[in-house]
Amino acid sequence: DDERLEILKNYHVTSIELGAQSMDDDVLKINRRGHTAKDVENASRLIKSYGFSLGLQMMTGLMGDTDEKCIKTAERLIALSPDTVRIYPTIVLENTPLADYLRDGSYRAETLNEAVSLCARLLLMFRENNIKVIRLGLHSGGNVDEGYLAGAYHPAFRELCEGKIYLEKMLSELSKLPKDMPYVIEVPEKSIGKAKGQNKRNEKALLNNGFQCKIKGNEFLNDYDIKITEDI
C-alpha cells in the first residue's frame, strides 16, 4: 500500500519484486498463494507509480497449471512492463504437501524436458519485449539438493533452455535448405557452447536430422541470432 511504499522510499529502496507465480486465479487458488491476478496487477502499477524498479516472478508446473496458462501468465506479466523477471519451474521436496500430492497421484511433476521446452518459449517472449530474465531455474545447493523428489531441477537449467532456442532456430533455418551439403552455422561468439548443446547434444541432433554442420562464433551476432552458409 501507499504507506509501506513511502517507508521503503525513505529508506532508499530502489527495486521491489513480487512473487506473482501465476496470473491464473484458479492456479493461484489451488496452490494457496493467497492473492489474485488482480492483486498482482494493482500492486505492480502502484510500485511503478512510486518510481521503483519492478521485478516479477513466475513459476511453471504448479498444480492445475498448463503450458497454455503459463504462456498467458507471461503475456499478462509483460503487459505490466516489469524491469526484470525470474522464472522458476516447480520442484517437489520431501516432507511437503506437494510430495503427498505426488505420491497419491493428484499431482504430476513437470519433467525436465517439458520445462526446458516451455521456459525456452518464455525466455524469448520476455526478450522480445525487452524484459530481462535475471534468473531461470533454482540455484543448486541447500535444501534443494537434500530434499529433491521430483520436478525440473538442473544446475545448468538456463543453459539447457538457451540450447533449446538455438537448436530450434537452427533446425528451422536448415529445413529450408538441401541436406546433401555441409554447412557452417555462425552464432554469437559467447554462445558457441550453448548452440552446440550440453555434451554436444545439439550437434548430434542436427546430424540425426540429416545435416552436417560446423558451429562457429561470430562476434557481431546478437543473442539467439544465427547465420548459415555452405561450408565450401
Tell me what each language-model feature is:
Residues 1-90, 94-113:
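Conserved non-cysteine loop/helix-boundary elements of the Radical SAM core domain that shape
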Residues 97, 104-232:
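Auxiliary Fe-S-binding modules of radical SAM enzymes
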